[in-house]
Amino acid sequence: MATTVGASSQFTSGVLEAAEQELRRTVSGEVRFDKFSRVLYSTDAGNYQMEPVGVVIPRGPEDVLATVEVARKHKIPVLPRCGATSLSGQCVNHAIVLDFTKHMDRVLEVNTEERWVR
């Protein structure tokens, strides 16, 4: 029987270890699966607390794509996080948290006609 990790029993330690190893190989930004980082990212400005399975701090769009691909392969949800100012728990979940605040913190382009932002 597989062991489980963290607050969520839906992911086995083997799945999380494989995902972490793949992320470390493919992401140029920071990959944090340690207990301290997971606890640090388990809350936002609200009262909710849910420990993520890991945290990725992407340096650019390639890191975001790599994270989503690894998460999809291992069936792990992805949760984008920016300001963590939600009072209703939108920034916390049993997922891989993508923290955009360190390197990807600017709007590069706004297209009002097509209604998208990059």
Task: Indicate residue ranges for each PLM-predicted region.
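Noncatalytic alpha-helical scaffold of FAD-dependent oxidoreductases
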Residues: 1-118
